[in-house]
Every structure is written in structure tokens, then in C-alpha cells.
Amino acid sequence: WIMGHMVNAIEQVDEFLNLGANAIEFDIDFDENGIAKYTHHGIPCDCGRLCTKSAVFTEYLDNVRQVTSPGDPKFRKELVLLALDLKLQRISSEKAYVAGVDVATKLLDHYWKRGWNGGRAYILLNIPLVEDYEFIKGFKDTLRKEGHEQYNAKVGINFTGNEDLDEIRKVLEKLGEDEHIWQADGITSCFPRGTDRLEKALEKRDTPGYKYISKVYAWTLVRSSIMRRSLRLNVDGVMSNYPDRVVGVLKEKEFADKFRLATYADNPWEKFTSI
């Protein structure tokens, strides 16, 4: 999965897909009551990027629904995963449950259309810190109460704050979640980062019987040398400001026979096993 980073304006969706992304990440900004208002990152953000691009969240969802709906004039078959970077650290943890309810409701109304011609992409809920775990409860409770638990099959969970992997597992156990779990590791592109935690996450992913990590990705990679380093460790995905650079690295002799771009036929919730 090549994840375009910080794709917050509607016009950026096609831009990042044209560069080779098959997944996009966008930031969800909440008001003080936990209501999702805009796709917006804000200052500071990655080096060399404009931090202020934004859209109304519901309008953004309406657009990506079209982009991921076969038969729609805007349809792009390559876009198979939407990563929602939930800026919950900007609001009180007490509002996390309400935020989960609100995001689920808006996805039902504007993305899935409650079963009527909705978008087909998989959804990854990127939650910054384990203390915000109530978001997941609010989200799942809403799908159940609204009679649309079928969408759980499309939804995954990812804690992105580089917290202790065992602490993350404990929270997932508490929630009763042991499927559809990704693990991110990374830092803003402005700073270097070692691979210690990334390697630990990959080791857990590859441990037989370990349920709490099915995919691992590294972020936010801009240098080809760091992309190569991550690929040599066998990550499942790379988040980048420059998807075209990732595409270029994947075409290199070292990687061309080992990796390919994920398509809609690839299940993002299953551990990859080579045939």
C-alpha cells in the first residue's frame, strides 16, 4: 500500500492517485464537542508541505465516495484504502466516544450511503493515542444501533502515536478487538527515525498466532534510501508525500520481484503469506 500523506483538499485526491498512490490519508479536525468538521492538518506539518489545505469533511466524503464507486464518472479503481487521521489529541479524551459516533454517522450518510451506492474502499481509523480508545466504542456502537454492522468488515484500527506495543495490545484486548489491526511507526518527515520499534512491530506481525497486528507501515518517508530500508524490513505499506518516489523504488531490481501494488482484491486485514 502506497499511502499518500495529508491529502486534505478535494483536488489533491486525483493528484496523489496520479502520482501512484493506492491509498490516501487525510486529517479529521474536530470542534470542542467532538464533531468532525474539516479535513485539515494545520501548522506545523511535514517539511515542504502546505499545512493549511482543507475541505468540509462531509463534502470530502461525498467526493471520495464517487472516486471509489464503480460506474461513477470519477471512479479510480486504484484507490482501495482510506486512512482517517483522527486529530483526537486536540480535544478532550471525554469527547472521544462522541467523536466516534459522529464519524460513523457521517460515513454512513455520506460514504456508505447506508447501503445505497456507497463507496467500496476499506477504511482505516488512525487513532493518535490509546487514551482515546472510546472513539472505537462510539464508532462500533453506532454501526450496531443503526443496523449497519456489515461495515465492520470494511473497517480497521491503527494506533499511530508510537506508543508501547504491549500497551496497545492491552487496550485492544480490553475492547475485544483482535482483527483488522494495522500498526504504524514513524515521525514527521522533518526528522530522522530509527527502526527499533518498527522492527518490533514487524516481529509481532510475523509471530504465529499473534492477532493484534496484521499489517505494518512506516511514515512519513520522503527519501528513497529510507523507503528502501523499510522495504528490506518487509513492511506492508509506506506513507509518503511523494508516492511517485515509492513507485520508482518498487521498480528497482531489488524489489520488483518481491513487491507489487495492492489492489481491491487484496484483503488489508489478513497477514500476507507468500505462496
From Swiss-Prot:
GO terms for molecular function: lyase activity; metal ion binding; phosphoric diester hydrolase activity; toxin activity. Keywords: Cytolysis, Dermonecrotic toxin, Disulfide bond, Hemolysis, Lipid degradation, Lipid metabolism, Lyase, Magnesium, Metal-binding, Secreted, Toxin. The keyword Cytoplasm does not apply. The keyword Disulfide bond applies. Its cofactor is Mg(2+). Expressed by the venom gland. Binds 1 Mg(2+) ion per subunit. Its main location: secreted. One of its GO terms (biological process) is lipid catabolic process. Disulfide bonds join C45-C51, C47-C190. It is found in: Secreted. Mg(2+) binds at E25, D27, D85. One of its GO terms (cellular component) is extracellular region. It catalyses: an N-(acyl)-sphingosylphosphocholine = an N-(acyl)-sphingosyl-1,3-cyclic phosphate + choline; an N-(acyl)-sphingosylphosphoethanolamine = an N-(acyl)-sphingosyl-1,3-cyclic phosphate + ethanolamine; a 1-acyl-sn-glycero-3-phosphocholine = a 1-acyl-sn-glycero-2,3-cyclic phosphate + choline; a 1-acyl-sn-glycero-3-phosphoethanolamine = a 1-acyl-sn-glycero-2,3-cyclic phosphate + ethanolamine. Its EC number is 4.6.1.-. The active site is at H5, H41. InterPro entries: PLC-like_Pdiesterase_TIM-brl (IPR017946). Belongs to the arthropod phospholipase D family. Class II subfamily. Dermonecrotic toxins cleave the phosphodiester linkage between the phosphate and headgroup of certain phospholipids (sphingolipid and lysolipid substrates), forming an alcohol (often choline) and a cyclic phosphate. This toxin acts on sphingomyelin (SM). It may also act on ceramide phosphoethanolamine (CPE), lysophosphatidylcholine (LPC) and lysophosphatidylethanolamine (LPE), but not on lysophosphatidylserine (LPS), and lysophosphatidylglycerol (LPG). It acts by transphosphatidylation, releasing exclusively cyclic phosphate products as second products. This is Dermonecrotic toxin SpaSicTox-betaIIA2. It comes from Sicarius patagonicus (Six-eyed sand spider).
